[in-house]
Amino acid sequence: MKRIAIQGLIGSFHDIAAHLYFEGEQIQLICCATFEEVFANMKKDPTMIGMLAIENTIAGSLLHNYELLRESGTTIVGEHKLHISHCICCLPEDDWDTITEVHSHPVALMQCRQFLAHHPHMKNVEGEDTAGSAKMIAEGQKKGWAAICHAEAAKLYGLKVLENHIEDNKHNFTRFLVVSNPNKADMLRPLMEANKASIVFSLPHEEGSLSHVLAILSFYKINLTKIQSLPIIGHEWEYLFYVDVMYNDLTRYRQAIDAITPLTKDLTILGEYKDGKQTN
C-alpha cells in the first residue's frame, strides 16, 4: 500500500487529487498541517510519497512550494490537474435564512467572491482548510455557520449542500505534483513514458542570458510550458528560474539540457515525468 503525505484533511482537494491520481490503487493518506510537514514526513520515511499543489489557473503559483521542492531533494514523478469546484454547506437543520457566517480557506473565499457578494449578511471567516471548515462545523454542531468546500467533503462530514458550483470561474484548475525519494522514482514512473520535465537554474547577470537559453530550447524543439522566477535571497536582482518543458524525443531533450547547462548556474532537474491528465 502506498503512503501519501498531503497538506490538509480527509475531504480536501489534495485528498481528491491523490485518489484520482492513484485511482485503482490502495493508498493511505498521511494528513499534514503544512507543506513543510509533508516534506518532513518524507524525510523521515523515504518510502513515503508526497502530493502538493504547485499552481492554480486563477490564484497563480504557490511560490513557497517551489522553494520547498528544490530544497527537499525529492524528485517529481507525476502530476494531476484537478478541476476546483466549491459548494456551500451547513448542518442539516440549517438553511439559507439561518446562515450568518461562512467559513473556508481564504483562497476558496476569494474564488467565490461573486457568490458571496449576493449574500452580504453572511460574515466571511477565513480558516486553514476547506475540508477543515466543514469538519469543524459538523463536529462542533455550529448552527448558523456554513462552509465552502468540495461537495465530497460536505458528504463526508454529513453536511447539507445548499448550492453547488458556486465558484466565480468555472475553468478553475489546480496542478498537483507527485514527489518521491529519487531512489524510488523509477518504481513510480517509467522514464521512457516521460514527456515533461521541471528544471531550475540561475543565470549570469548578463544581457541576453535568458534569451540564449530559450533559443537553444527552441532549436531542439523543446516546448516551454511554464517559467517562474524567484529572487535569490542575499543576491540582489538575481533569480532562480523554474522551468517546465515538454518533449516528444528523449534524446533531443537530453541534448538540449547538455547544451544549456554551460550557460546556466546550478542547473537541477527536479523531475522527468508524464504530462498529467486533467479531471473535471
Regions picked out by a protein language model, each given a short descriptive name:
Residues M1-N280:
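Domain-level signature for soluble enzymes in the chorismate/prephenate branch of the shikimate pathway
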